[in-house]
Amino acid sequence: MPLPDFRLIRLLPLAALVLTACSVTTPKGPGKSPDSPQWRQHQQDVRNLNQYQTRGAFAYISDQQKVYARFFWQQTGQDRYRLLLTNPLGSTELELNAQPGNVQLVDNKGQRYTADDAEEMIGKLTGMPIPLNSLRQWILGLPGDATDYKLDDQYRLSEITYSQNGKNWKVVYGGYDTKTQPAMPANMELTDGGQRIKLKMDNWIVK
């Protein structure tokens, strides 16, 4: 089914969800150089992951709407991933399955949509301009196409600034889960003007 030009999905705007940091390491001290071999090694270790999944809390906040949800993100291969959003009551609001050249999304009414660009689809159906194509790298602690970024004292991303298509995103990492090797982001916040996206990862499973 072709995509409509209006917002279809409306997640329950319940404020019961509080995005708090779990017991993780937080960036401290002066940052390290992006040219350091430790940072290059960390990037390589993350890129070597073939499969991974994480779940946690999601919040989108703007002047127009406030959305709170639980999310599940699973990568099963290169450019093959699944994103599930559930409302605070546990009901599925959105399920997205992506593979090269094809994206399918099922809404909370069971209606199925197809497209070739997941980011555009999410934006049209939810009204939330989530930078999904870049977020796939940022959620792993990788800069993606961004060249303006900073590292913490453990040679991990602490901040990204990225401009594309009229959007000026700033990404700030609040901590890393060191129980996972390589260490993976535990919480992060994206801002663009009056828009904010918060992600808190409860846990990671990597292979």
UniProtKB/Swiss-Prot annotation:
UniProt KW keywords: Cell outer membrane, Chaperone, Lipoprotein, Membrane, Palmitate, Protein transport, Signal, Transport
Membrane association type: Lipid-anchor
Lipidation, N-palmitoyl cysteine type: C22
Signal peptide location: 1-21
InterPro entries xrefs: LolA/LolB/LppX, OM_lipoprot_LolB
GO cellular component: cell outer membrane; outer membrane-bounded periplasmic space
Pfam families in the cross-refs: LolB
GO biological process per UniProt: lipoprotein localization to outer membrane; lipoprotein metabolic process; protein transport
CDD domains: LolB
Role of this protein: Plays a critical role in the incorporation of lipoproteins in the outer membrane after they are released by the LolA protein. Essential for E.coli viability.
Similarity remark: Belongs to the LolB family.
NCBIfam families per UniProt: lolB
Protein name: Outer-membrane lipoprotein LolB
UniProt source species: Escherichia coli (strain K12)
Gene, per the UniProt record: lolB
